[in-house]
Amino acid sequence: MSAKPHVPATRQLKKRLGASVDTSKHGCWAASFDSSKISFLPEAVITPRKEKEVGILLELANKHRVPVTVRGRGTTLMGSAAPVRGGWVIDMRKLKGIKIDADAGLAHAGAGATTGDIQRAAAAQGWFYPPDPSSKEYCTIGGNIACNAGGMHGGKYGVTRDFVIALRGFLPTGEFVEWG
């Protein structure tokens, strides 16, 4: 089997997303492991700058049966950000917008926003976001949701799932969906 079986699909992806697609040795190596130290080399790392780019790459991955691993900053100790099947890694760090709706008591945050940034944005509006994993300055809310992060405040206030009331995302087909 070829070390890079998805080269044609990756070329198509580069045509559609351009600079968001990194196939360099260094770029792929940097996304090959997380804090668990489990390591598998992907064929490409895609860093979407707009939400719709996630849908484009998932649609293409689904069409060509390319395995996809979603990654924030790789702080997980569970191995969930390591691309165990190779394929493509979606690096969500650029999708980090945060909007606090103080009147409704809601935070709208991109998957790449760090927990620490969300906490500070909420505090600036008089609100408190309790989940506080020890890696809060580096870990992303997308990863927190995926792993149900808690931290020291978890016993008193609850963990991430207790504070999520709606999600936006994409199905493997690239279709945009909203839950909640």
Where are these regions (language model features)?
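N-terminal flexible segment immediately upstream of the FAD-binding catalytic core
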Residues: M1-E59, T75-G105, R120, S134, ...
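Conserved PLP-anchoring active-site segment centered on the Schiff-base-forming lysine
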Residues: T69-R71
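Residue-level detector of anion-binding/catalytic polar loops
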Residues: V66-P67, F128
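FAD-binding subdomain of flavoenzyme oxidoreductases
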Residues: G97-D101, A107-G180
